[in-house]
Curated annotation (Swiss-Prot):
GO cellular component, one term: plasma membrane
Assigned protein family: Belongs to the FtsK/SpoIIIE/SftA family.
Function (record text): Essential cell division protein that coordinates cell division and chromosome segregation. The N-terminus is involved in assembly of the cell-division machinery. The C-terminus functions as a DNA motor that moves dsDNA in an ATP-dependent manner towards the dif recombination site, which is located within the replication terminus region. Translocation stops specifically at Xer-dif sites, where FtsK interacts with the Xer recombinase, allowing activation of chromosome unlinking by recombination. FtsK orienting polar sequences (KOPS) guide the direction of DNA translocation.
Principal subcellular localization: membrane
Species: Escherichia coli O6:H1 (strain CFT073 / ATCC 700928 / UPEC)
Name under which the protein is recorded: DNA translocase FtsK
One family name in Pfam for this protein: FtsK_SpoIIIE
């Protein structure tokens, strides 16, 4: 058979047939094509040439080249994101074809058809699900064309959620049709995987990792004495390990080399001298009789089996483990006393001299420095030396303990009945961790069952002691707090024989446990709270959580443990009796509640071990726990401060009153907390100064909850009553000394509620005066009961004492900052955190509030309102009906036209009409109002010429108008890719495409519309778009707001050159400064030889790169106070925004018209741009001079065609719908474009303004709004240089004729009306003529020239 197997392993090369050669070659090519396709899909770039884009000006980015770009674009267009799965599907198909290439089975065409149907269903539903739920990829729909068709079809019928569910159902059916898998099988497979993962995770968490390196724990100076003792014990442990190794080698002689007797070795409990079986596994390690995995009996099994390996053959390692457990327990709870390991008596059995089967028996009497070995008599005593330290420490408990000791004495003696002959004692130390705690749910019946088992003991020595078992007294034993009334039973005196000094084996793990036990005991001593006024403890309530096994000192556990144990169950009974002796105060009624951490189904029901790790001082300090010395110093400091507070010498009357109010508030909060529990504090505001303390407390609370749930929090308080199992002891439980870890972490669990206190800083100096809350916890250690401090464990779970943990946690934070905290009551006296008397709501956009500086260079789009994710689909059926209705209404007016196309938009829908031959478009324009009436719409706008089409447009409003959000317009490639810092967004056109304009190319903008038409919203959208595009060093603003409402919200942003101008006199000066700045920039640009500001800035940047800045060519030493020659710097664009241009014209008059005209004519090259907005589109405001220099205009809704012609030079604005609906006449274009303006809320404007305020303060330029040379700042002329050249001749004419009129000057000098009016105004300013009277006449004040 092996020869045949060897021949099969030889690999031979076989020739393929021609068909298979061709097939495999074809499959290889297809796989390579799939890899290439995946690379093309992953490297897709929208700028590459493709089906949707044929022109490009950059190199191809796609890894597949031009074919890859075309193919990727096509697949994305058709399938969307599902295109990424196509290469995977191709590779899977190739693999399937290769695997089934040799099968010549009959082809089931019905099955093939079902698979094809399943594939189609999977493709369609996957694309539909992607279209409904996934975001779009690049500029493609997420589900491609297929998904878009499905989503648009299903959403009107089933909505998005219903469509998703329907598509999921079809997808599931398609998967079954394609693969043939049943969903029941899929669910079972998934469940099996999940259970395997959970089983693996649970088995990993049950691993015993309690042994760690000694370096993990910090060694303190106070442990030097213990370290010397531990070294001495380690030497003995090494000697014993050598003996155990020899026994291991001897045991290996009985092991089958092939390992065929592994199962028998694992599950056997026989002695080593039994020839047929051994107690070792294949690895030579002794089998653990208490292991829940390898034990074959349950702890609650009532009958006795004389061939039971657990009860009939106890291994020799059991007394060693018992002694080790007792040693660890004793040292962990009696650290001040020298740790001693007692020796139980040796069983009287003949054994070979090379295998000393010595049982370790504790000798009664005072503790000695060295342990002794005593042979075990036939009835050895139950009182052991391990109980002596606890009894001496708790002297008041000796009387009530004695009557209870003989009560469970038979259970303690039962393990002695069987001598054992285990050949080796190599049990691992972690064996005792599996403590059989939960096998006795009922107090009386459980113990009776154990007594019945003990009657089957083969020895009669212990049968006479069954009279001491009183099941009837078991129930009141744990209910009555005075067990002294029971009659004690006299025990036989222990026989002390000659012993020789020796010690039980101490393994390395036991040494670690000893050190950790000493650390736990020392930490428990550290955290004894400072004594306070004594108060009687509250009575114990039955609803409290039962203390853990380690709550009672495990020193007593070894007293009742027999070295010749016949089973785990009887040893557990004995340790339960010792637990009753050690802790009578906590003996409460038993209960049958379920116990945690029990593995059922195999062996006795034993609890899982609990991992314990004692935190170091450094970790405790990180948790906020401090040492007793520090707490004592804090207590002294609090006492001194309390005395100082009581004296009241350093506080005035106001401070004392504030402290009294704080104390009343604290008492009220405490009362409310006691009434409503801990949840009351969650609603109280936290003081900002305690933010760090609150964070520490929260971290400590979370860590404590984790530790509590992991180690001792499996059973909530009050969930299960007390049971006898809570006080059971065993050798396993002795080493599992997890009792002190809960009191150690109690300071961590308790400060949970501290940050939520209403007056945390003020409460701290009042803590010494409130000893009532801490008394139930601090009084417990003062009682003369040894296990009393452990009884504090369930107290942190009581809801009626939430104040004590908070005060306890605040103490570590007081020593350093305690003195400043006494000044905290002065803070509530301050009415506002702001240093101002103004109300916070009166702050202009929160100008003085502290702001956090953002990290992004420009504001985030998250500040703006996002558009809704679900957009209502277009009702094509309704549009078809409207098209037929339009044709019918036109036919009513004898106009034959056909609707050839329609373009739905967010606000209006354009119907394209193909007029019959000979029909003029003017006829439809004249019928616009009649068509609106007949079609029952608000307004109808007729577009006579559509660029590029021979049709006439008819624009009708939609029934449901959609809002155009600024965020969706800004988040667009047209806006992002525009490099100009003056890019502004207007909204969307009738097709829903964003409209983006460049203010630098306009170069000025005139905005007009009636009140409420959306003019101010449009201006805000332009400003915000520039704030999202440019930095302050690129664009600066001069804002003129006569109404003091629209642009004043931008006060304080760093883009402003000066404060928002609200006085029209200052507005004229600002415009004049712009004219002077324009002239200065022209001089600088001419000196550098550039044509515009962009070229000027490029020259400056080039000089900076050369490290040779350009000096100012027009600077003179007397021009400024600079010591050095100033250099030229980068000049920003300046945008002058006037919100109400008509008010400026009316207030200042025609004087600013010249300034605006000059800026409109020349300021474009200098980088100064005007945005003029007005709600009065009349000819006296928008004059011909202004219109001639501002070609770019925006018209919102106006009242008449005349106003529309004033703005746009054509009609159409009167037919707009309002609320942002506008006509935009761009540069170099005479045809206006209908745009639906982006909507901007006030909250969005405030958010963006606050974001820019947080980035920096504005750097204002002095002298923009002030003009010292003009008279009152409104003259508009700078002395004689501004006078008209004909001024002197006109003055001579007026003084000679003695008549001053604008028409007379105009006729005399043949000039225009505006120039003649300015000359007369100049005469008025010079005092030559008087002001205009009520009849329009003026008087000549100057004398005649010849007088």
């Amino acid at each position: 058979m092996s020869q045949e197997y060897t021949e099969d392993k030889e690999v031979t090369l076989t020739k393929l047939s021609s068909g298979r050669r061709l097939l495999e070659a074809l499959l290889i090519l297809i796989v390579l094509f799939a890899v290439w396709l995946m690379a093309a899909l992953l490297s897709f770039n929208p700028s590459d040439p493709s089906w949707s884009q044929t022109a490009w000006h950059e190199p191809i980015h796609n890894l597949g080249g031009m074919p890859g770009a075309w193919l990727a674009d096509t697949l994305f267009f058709i399938f969307g994101v599902m295109a990424y799965t196509i290469p995977v599907i191709i590779v899977g198909g190739c693999w399937f074809a290769w695997r089934h290439q040799s099968s010549d089975e009959y082809i089931d065409y019905f099955a093939v058809s079902l698979r094809i149907i399943g594939v189609l269903a999977l493709i369609l539903t996957s694309c539909g699900l992607a279209a409904i739920n996934a975001d779009d990829i690049w500029y493609f729909a997420s589900g491609g064309v297929i998904g878009s068709l499905l989503s648009t079809t299903l959403q009107p019928l089933l909505h998005s959620s219903g469509g998703t569910i329907a598509l999921l159902c079809v997808w599931a059916a398609g998967l079954t049709l394609f693969t043939g898998w049943s969903w029941v099988t899929i669910a079972e497979k998934l469940g099996g995987w999940i259970l395997n993962i959970l089983t693996f995770a649970s088995n990993r968490t049950r691993r015993d990792d309690t042994w760690v390196d000694e370096d993990e724990y910090e060694d303190d100076e106070e442990y030097e004495d213990e370290n010397h003792g531990k070294q001495h014990e380690s030497r003995r442990a090494r000697i014993l390990r050598g003996a155990l190794a020899r026994r291991k080698r001897l045991a290996e002689k009985f092991i089958n080399p092939m390992g065929r007797q592994t199962d028998a070795a694992l599950f056997s409990g026989k002695r080593m001298d039994d020839e047929e079986e051994i107690t070792y596994t294949a690895r030579g390690v002794a089998a653990d009789p208490d292991d829940v995995l390898f034990s074959g009996n349950r702890a609650t099994q009532p009958e006795y089996d004389e061939y039971d390996p657990l009860l009939n053959g106890a291994p020799i390692t059991e007394p060693v483990a018992v002694a080790a457990a007792a040693t660890t327990a004793t040292q962990s709870w009696a650290a001040p006393v020298e740790p001693v390991t007692q020796t139980p008596p040796v069983a009287s059995v003949d054994v070979p001299p090379t295998q000393p089967t010595v049982a370790w028996q504790p000798v009664p009497g005072p503790q000695t420095g060295e342990p002794v070995i005593a042979p075990a008599p036939e009835g050895y005593p139950h009182q052991s030396q391990y109980a002596q330290p606890a009894v001496q420490y708790n002297e008041p408990l000796q009387q009530p303990v004695q009557p209870q000791q003989p009560y469970y004495a038979p259970a303690a003696e039962q393990p002695v009945q069987q001598p054992y002959y285990a050949p080796a004692a190599e049990q691992p130390v972690q064996q005792p961790y599996y403590a059989p705690a939960p096998e006795q749910p009922v107090a009386g019946n459980a113990w009776q069952a154990e007594e019945q088992q003990s009657t089957f003991a083969p020895q009669s020595t212990y049968q006479t002691e069954q009279t001491y078992q009183q099941p009837a007294a078991q129930e009141p034993l744990y209910q009555q707090p005075q067990p002294v009334e029971q009659q004690p039973v006299v025990e036989p005196e222990p026989v002390v024989e000659e012993t020789k000094p020796t010690r039980p084996p101490l393994y390395y793990f036991e040494e670690v446990e000893e050190k950790r036990a000493r650390e736990r005991e020392q930490l428990a001593a550290w955290y004894q709270p400072i004594p306070e006024p004594v108060k009687e403890p509250e009575p114990i309530k039955s609803s409290l959580k039962a203390p853990s096994v380690a709550a009672v000192p495990p020193v007593e556990a070894a007293a009742a443990v027999s070295p010749l144990a016949s089973g785990v169950k009887k040893a557990t009974l004995a340790t339960g009796a010792a637990a009753t002796v050690a802790a009578p105060v906590f003996s409460l009624a038993n209960s049958g509640g379920p116990r945690p951490q029990v593995k059922e189904g195999i062996g006795p029901q034993l609890p899982r071990p609990k991992r314990i790790r004692v935190p170091t001082r450094r970790e405790l300090a990180s948790y906020g726990i401090k040492l007793p010395s520090q707490r004592a110093a804090e207590e002294k400091a609090r006492e001194a401060q309390r005395n100082q507070y009581d004296s009241g010498d350093q506080y005035n009357d106001d401070e004392i009153d504030a402290m009294q109010q704080d104390e009343l508030a604290r008492q009220f909060a405490q009362t409310q907390q006691q009434r409503y529990g801990e949840q009351y504090q969650h609603d109280v505001p936290v003081n900002t100064e305690d933010a760090d303390a609150a964070a520490e407390a929260e971290l400590a609370r979370q860590f404590a909850q984790t530790q509590q749930q992991r180690y001792s929090g499996e059973q909530p308080a009050g969930a299960n009553p007390f049971s006898l199992d809570d006080f059971e002891f065993s050798p396993m439980k002795a080493l599992l000394d997890d009792g002190p870890h809960e009191p150690l972490f109690t300071p961590i669990v308790e400060p949970v509620q501290q940050p939520q206190q209403p007056v945390a800083p003020q409460q701290q100096y009042q803590q010494p005066q409130q000893p009532v809350a801490p008394q139930p916890q601090y009084q417990q250690p003062q009682q003369p009961v040894a296990p009393q401090p452990q009884y504090q464990q369930p107290q942190y779970q009581q809801p009626q004492q939430p104040v004590a943990p908070q005060q306890q946690y605040q103490q570590p934070q007081q020593p350093v900052t305690q003195q400043p905290q006494y000044q905290q009551p002065q803070q509530p006296v301050v009415p506002q955190p702001q240093d101002t008397l103004l109300h916070p709501l009166l702050m202009r956009n929160g100008d003085s509030r502290p702001l956090h500086k953002p990290t992004t260079p420009l504001p985030s789009l998250d500040l703006l309102t996002p558009p809704p994710s679900e957009v209502e689909p277009v009702d094509t059926f309704a549009l078809e009906q409207m098209a037929r209705l339009v044709e019918a209404r036109l036919a009513d007016f004898r106009i034959k036209a056909d609707v050839v196309n329609y373009s739905p938009g967010p606000v209006i829908t354009r119907f394209e009409l193909n007029l019959a031959p000979g029909v003029k478009a003017a006829r439809i324009s004249n019928l616009s109002r009649d068509l609106a009436r007949s079609l029952s719409t608000v307004a109808v706008r007729v577009v006579e010429v559509i660029p590029g089409k021979p049709y006439v447009g008819l624009e009708l409003p939609n029934k449901k108008r959609q809002t155009v959000y600024l965020r969706e317009v800004l988040d667009n490639a047209k806006f992002r890719d525009n490099p100009s810092p003056l890019t502004v967004v207007l909204g969307k056109d009738i097709a829903g495409e964003p409209v983006v304009a460049d203010l630098a190319k306009m170069p000025h903008l005139l905005v007009a519309g009636t009140t409420g038409s959306g003019k101010s919203v449009g201006v805000n959208a332009m400003i915000l778009s520039m704030l999202y595009k440019a930095q302050p060093e690129d664009v600066r603003f001069i804002m003129i707001d006569p109404k003091m409402l629209e642009l004043s919200v931008y006060e304080g942003i760093p883009h402003l050159l000066t404060e928002v101008v609200t006085d029209m006199k200052d507005a004229a000066n600002a415009l004049r400064w712009c004219v002077n700045e324009m002239e200065r920039r022209y001089k600088l640009m001419s000196a550098l030889g550039v044509r515009n500001l962009a070229g000027y800035n490029e020259k400056i940047a080039e000089a900076d790169r050369m490290m040779r800045p350009i000096p100012d060519p027009y600077w003179k030493p007397g021009d400024s106070m600079d010591a050095q020659h100033p250099v030229l710097k980068k000049e920003p664009y300046i945008v002058v925004l006037v919100d109400e241009f008509a008010d400026l014209m009316m207030t200042v008059g025609k004087k600013v018209e010249e300034l605006i005209a000059r800026l409109a004519q020349k300021a474009r090259a200098a980088g100064i741009h005007l945005v003029l907005a007005t709600q009065r589109p009349s000819v006296d405001v928008i004059t011909g001079l202004i219109k001639a220099n501002i070609p770019t205009r925006i018209a919102f809704t106006v009242s008449s065609k005349i106003d529309s012609r004033t703005i746009l030079d054509q009609a159409g604005a009167e037919s707009l719908l309002g609320m942002g609906d506008m006509l935009y006449s761009g540069p170099n274009s005479t045809l206006p474009v209908r745009v639906h303006g982006a909507f901007v809320r006030d909250q969005e404007v405030h958010a963006v303004v606050q974001d820019w305020k947080a980035r920096g303060r504005p750097q204002y330029v002095d002298g923009i709004t002030s003009d010292s040379e003009s008279e009152g700042g409104v003259g508009g002329f700078d002395g004689a240089e501004e006078l008209d050249p004909l001024f002197d001749q006109a003055v001579q004419f007026v003084t000679e004729k003695r008549k001053a009129s604008i028409s007379g000057v105009q006729r005399q000098f043949r000039i225009g009306y505006n120039r003649a009016a300015r000359i007369i105004e100049q005469m008025e300013a010079q005092g030559i003529v008087s002001e205009q009277g009520h009849n329009g006449n003026r008087e000549v004040l100057a004398p005649p020239p010849f007088d």
